[in-house]
């Protein structure tokens, strides 16, 4: 296990932002969100009074409460009384009672990314941007830096299993964080190092449906780097590669491509482990094994290795951190193998492998399917999928049809709206019809998450790999399946 408490960290005096001396209590509207909770935890550990509200309890709210934060359920105007500043995410609507009250009381209101930018202002910021892979890449950078004794502060969009949290206040100069392009709020950040993993059309409502506006915003983000900063770019992604001539900043590239400055060769996946050799200019080849499956995770690791190499971290720390990496919650999270008997035959009892994954964009789903196929080619792949947002389903409809047709058995939940109004023809029944017309598989529509365990009992057979996939409330399904459907671990 990579310890997140380093004993030989570089000397660094943690100071609160001097101009924030007037701030005593910081209130978070929607404190249970991963990004919000992470920043709240760092500020709490810096000595600020933290309060917050959300509409439901989750692991983040429970953890923050245990750490000393005041967390209440429900958004009410009186929740912000006594707050010096109110922090909101882009998910909070303008008519939110607490937001309205803050404006009436002239309490400063800042976006989540603005507060993250303040934390980064007096540190060596490493920001990870891109459509996919941000959480895993950020986690890998943090793990390598911790293994090397650099004791970083980090704010991650998922639970880093080795730390038991998605955030930590370190004692060094380093702050490692995700940079969120979904609402263009990453423009607030001014890091020393920026990683761009890939760029695809997603969250296009923010960019008025104009892909060029999305690209221009990425360039603007990278121009926030100082002239002595570093842009770490995935050369395997053609869109990212095409941006490099526009940057006017020092760059380091990574990928499987021969053109990459940090390159992977001789890749081989065995179950959940990916082994490969890293080539870097002027350095000896480095043979590593990453405790994550799939080529997409190799790319994430290469980005982390590029940053670590630039910071002078030794190869032994890099190799050790990748090998011991314990993963992130809901990123190809392996729940285990569970005993199951075949109810419809006289076959011997077998087992089902259960994996949960957060991926909800067609490219992410495709990468997860590929990793499952390469690691466990003999298993029948059963996917329980929940589309996320009607707008994404509408905009990427044919891509979803193509990728979801690649599994052996598909159980489809209704679209998780995330507050959006339903869009005609972009619902799960429509997706099922379109997939069925392809003639490859016959998807099963499942109305609610509560109905899924019963459906699975009738579908699963010994030897299956069950993959629960999506970003909505399907996230709680894997644990429930493990206890209600697959109760005996083998």
Swiss-Prot record:
Pfam families: Mur_ligase, Mur_ligase_C, Mur_ligase_M. Gene3D superfamilies: Mur ligase, C-terminal domain, Mur-like, catalytic domain, NAD(P)-binding Rossmann-like Domain. It comes from the Bacteria. It catalyses: UDP-N-acetyl-alpha-D-muramate + L-alanine + ATP = UDP-N-acetyl-alpha-D-muramoyl-L-alanine + ADP + phosphate + H(+). One of its GO terms (biological process) is cell wall organization. It is an enzyme of class 6 (ligase). Keywords: ATP-binding, Cell cycle, Cell division, Cell shape, Cell wall biogenesis/degradation, Cytoplasm, Ligase, Nucleotide-binding, Peptidoglycan synthesis. This is UDP-N-acetylmuramate--L-alanine ligase. One of its GO terms (cellular component) is cytoplasm. The keyword Cell wall biogenesis/degradation applies. Its main location: cytoplasm. ATP binds at residues 130-136. Cell wall formation. GO terms for molecular function: ATP binding; UDP-N-acetylmuramate-L-alanine ligase activity. It is found in: Cytoplasm. Belongs to the MurCDEF family. Pathway: Cell wall biogenesis; peptidoglycan biosynthesis. Its EC number is 6.3.2.8. The keyword Cell cycle applies. It comes from Idiomarina loihiensis (strain ATCC BAA-735 / DSM 15497 / L2-TR).
């Amino acid at each position: 296990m990579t310890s997140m408490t380093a004993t030989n960290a570089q000397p660094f005096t943690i100071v609160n932002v001097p101009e924030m001396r007037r701030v005593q209590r910081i209130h978070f509207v929607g404190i249970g969100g991963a990004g919000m909770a992470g920043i709240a935890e760092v500020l709490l550990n810096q000595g600020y009074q933290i309060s917050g509200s959300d509409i439901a309890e989750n692991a983040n709210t429970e953890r923050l409460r245990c750490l000393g934060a005041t967390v209440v359920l429900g958004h009410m105007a009186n929740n912000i009384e006594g707050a010096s500043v109110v922090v909101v995410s882009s998910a909070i609507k303008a008519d939110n009672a607490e937001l309205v009250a803050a404006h009436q009381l002239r309490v400063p209101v800042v976006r989540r990314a603005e507060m993250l930018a303040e934390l980064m202002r007096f540190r060596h910021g490493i920001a990870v941007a891109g459509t996919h892979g941000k959480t895993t890449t950020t986690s890998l950078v943090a793990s390598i830096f911790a293994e090397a004794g650099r004791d970083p502060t980090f704010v991650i969009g998922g639970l880093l299993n080795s730390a038991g949290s998605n955030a930590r206040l370190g004692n060094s100069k380093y702050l490692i964080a995700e940079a969120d392009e979904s609402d263009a709020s990453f423009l607030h950040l001014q890091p020393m190092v920026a990683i761009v993993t890939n760029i695809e059309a997603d969250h296009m409502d923010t960019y008025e449906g104009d892909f060029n506006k999305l690209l221009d915003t990425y360039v603007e983000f990278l121009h926030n780097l100082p002239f002595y900063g570093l842009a770490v770019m995935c050369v395997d992604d053609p869109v990212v590669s095409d941006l490099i001539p526009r940057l006017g900043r020092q760059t380091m590239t990574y990928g499987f491509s021969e053109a990459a400055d940090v390159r992977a060769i001789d890749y081989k996946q065995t179950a959940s482990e990916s082994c490969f050799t890293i080539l870097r200019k002027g350095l000896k080849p480095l043979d590593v094994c990453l405790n994550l499956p799939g080529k997409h995770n190799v790319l994430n690791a290469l980005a982390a290795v590029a940053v670590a190499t630039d910071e002078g971290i030794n190869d032994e720390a890099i190799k050790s951190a990748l090998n011991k990496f314990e993963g992130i919650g809901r990123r190809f999270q392996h729940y285990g193998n569970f005993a199951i008997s075949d109810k419809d035959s006289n076959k011997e009892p077998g087992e089902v492998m259960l994996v949960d994954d957060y991926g909800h964009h067609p490219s992410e789903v495709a990468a997860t399917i590929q990793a499952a196929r390469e690691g466990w080619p003999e298993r029948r792949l059963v996917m329980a999928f929940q589309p996320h947002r009607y707008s994404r389903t509408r905009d990427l409809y044919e891509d979803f049809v193509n990728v979801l047709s690649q599994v052996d058995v598909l159980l489809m939940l209704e679209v998780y709206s995330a507050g959006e109004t339903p869009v005609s023809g972009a619902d799960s029944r429509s997706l099922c019809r379109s997939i069925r017309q392809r003639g490859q598989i016959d998807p099963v529509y499942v109305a609610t998450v509560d109905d899924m365990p019963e459906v699975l009992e009738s579908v699963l057979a010994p030897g299956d790999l069950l993959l629960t996939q999506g970003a909505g409330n399907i996230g709680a399904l894997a644990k429930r399946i493990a206890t209600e459907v697959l109760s005996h671990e083998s």
